[in-house]
Every structure is written in structure tokens, then in C-alpha cells.
Amino acid sequence: MAFIGKLFNALRRSRDRVSNAFQQLVKEKVSPQSLEQLEETLLASDLGLSTVEDILDIVKKHSHENFLNEVADYMQQSLDQEKQLEIQTPSVMLVVGVNGTGKTTTAAKLANYYVDQGKKVLLVAADTYRAAAIAQLQQWSKRLNVRMVCNENSQDPSSVLFDGLQSAKSEDIDLVIVDTAGRLHTYTNLMNELEKMARVVSNRFPEFNLISMMTIDANLGQNSLHQAREFAKSVKLDGAVLTKMDGTARGGIVFALKNELYIPVLFVGIGEELNDLEEFDHQEYIRSLLGLEEAEE
């Protein structure tokens, strides 16, 4: 699979640091000094304090065995989820997140993904504050041959969403994907606006299953965790897309999202093209992170 090689390369920064730290631990044997160095490395890779503490406990407990496999087993169990998100028909997916996390591109990638799954998709450009976002999504929609609903004369995202869902009902759309305005979690009025959009779906279009997907910049580390925590106060987050997974990304934030906020990473963005979005495979992710296997071409 090409994705394995891409993910392997995207995790290069964390993989090199983490695998080197564990290999050094094997050579030097477990000691207070080597454990402290491992702790610093894991924290720097954004795994989160609780996850790091658990890993250190495993290393101590299995210090005379192959503790790397034990660590891998723990990581896999901590990220286990029953199955990938199932899209009921009809559904509406709000793509939410902070400015600069790649919401508009991710909305297009998700549309491409679900069209490939055989879904009839409609895009809604509800980022009414940024004309460039509407124009960008319009270009993507043409490439995808997917219809897009927008209203360049309206500053009310909920109104645009309403129009989109009305169209979706008349056209028997399976999935409506909504590009929302980027907002800082500290902007109370914009967060209230997001809550209003969720109410429009639940109150006016109860036949639609509401899904909220947050875009998370893989390079922002623990700051992304704080952002997700605040967003979760306004809308129920069903999953996250880890974006900007390039060679500098640390990527360990997936553990904190799942273990502290119960938000699973469902997709990983590993490039700018429409096909550069993959289902998150946590087993492959952990093997890549720990350097347990070579990338497959």
C-alpha cells in the first residue's frame, strides 16, 4: 500500500526520536537516567502525560524482557475502536476547527472519499466570512463533479446550511459535507454560531444524522488538545482528521485525543491532493511510530 510508505515518512520526526530512545534504552539497560531521557522524548512527541506515565510503568515492569512489544500492545489497545465511522443515510457532517488547520481542503477530501464509497454527496460552503474559502471549495466541487451550495450574499452560516439541507432533501443526498468558518476556540460568538448550526440540523432536519468532524493540525501538539477540549463544549465531536502530516509532524496527539477526550482520529491527511486522505490505521501508525517495520513501497 502506498499509504504505508507515506505515513512512515510523515512520522519521520517522531519515529526517529522515539525508536532511537527505545533502542538506546535497550543498549544502556533501564535506569533512572535512561527512563528520564525516554520520558522527555515521549513528551516531546506529544503523547500526553498519562500515556507517557503508563509507558514508563510498562518499561519498568518488563525491563528484563522485550518491553518494546509490550509498549506496542499497550498503544494499540489504547487506540482501539470498534469500527470506522458509519455514515447513516442521510447524514450531515460539519467540518470544524481552528483557522489554518485545512478545513476546506479536508471537506473536499472527505467528499472525494465518500463519493468513492458510493455515496451521493453535496458540499455546503458555510464559511461566509472568507470568500476565498467559497471559491476554493467551488473549484474542488467541479473537480469532484459534486454539487455545491453557497450564498455569497449571506453572512449567516446557518442560513446557508438550511438552504443546503433543503436541497439535499429534494435530491435524496446521502451525505452533506459542510465547510464551516475557522474560529478560535476563545471566540464566544463564533462558538455560539456553531451551536446554532447544530440546532438547525436537529430541530429543522431531524431526519439527518449529525456528525461533527474536527480538523487537527498535527504540528500544533498539545495546543490542539486544548482546542479540541473547547470545541467539544459546543458540539459533540465524533472524530478528528489529523492534517498536515509531513516529515516534521510529531503525531503523538492521537493518544491524548482518544484517552483524555474520547475523540478518535478517523482520518489522516498526508498531502494536498484529493486522494491524500486515508482512514487512520492505528496499528500501522504505532508500528511506524516505533519503527517496528520498514516502510512498504
Indicate residue ranges for each PLM-predicted region.
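Disorder-to-helix initiation segments
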Residues: 1-11
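Primarily NTPase-proximal linker/entry elements flanking Walker-type ATP/GTP-binding cores
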Residues: 9, 13-128, 133-169, 173-178
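Short beta-strand segments
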Residues: 96-97, 179, 215, 269
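Active-site proximal helix/loop that lines the substrate pocket
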Residues: 112, 182, 220
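Generic detector of well-ordered alpha-helical packing
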Residues: 126-128, 180, 218, 244
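Conserved catalytic-core segment of NTP-binding enzymes
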Residues: 157-171, 185-290, 294
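Short, flexible active-site loops
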Residues: 178-184
